[in-house]
Amino acid sequence: MQRKHNKDIVPTAKMLRKNMTKEEKYLWYDFLCTYPVRFSRQKVLGKYIADFYCAEAKLVIELDGSGHYTEEGKQYDEKRTAFLEEYGLTIIRIPNMEIHKNFRGVCEHIDHLVEQSLSQLR
């Protein structure tokens, strides 16, 4: 993604990295931080902050808590997704409950998407 990011939200991203949700911690420490392709946490992309971002695979992972299911949350997520997709990024949304109920399946799904993306980009 070549577009400049909003420097005003960098402090917010840093704060979010220090105060991850339990689902973000679980996915990060038990899977993404040791994944063979590099992921970043709370990455500023344009005017938004992505929960997890893999530049090499052009993949954004968003973990969705209850706030994402309100009408306002859904509208915000739609705008954000459209903005990020303009830059060729793939956005996947994972409900927080899925992290608890099917962690292995979530990891396998992410792995599949990364491999698929990398094979298309090569």
Stretches with model-predicted labels:
Residues 1-122:
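Nucleic-acid endo/exonuclease domains
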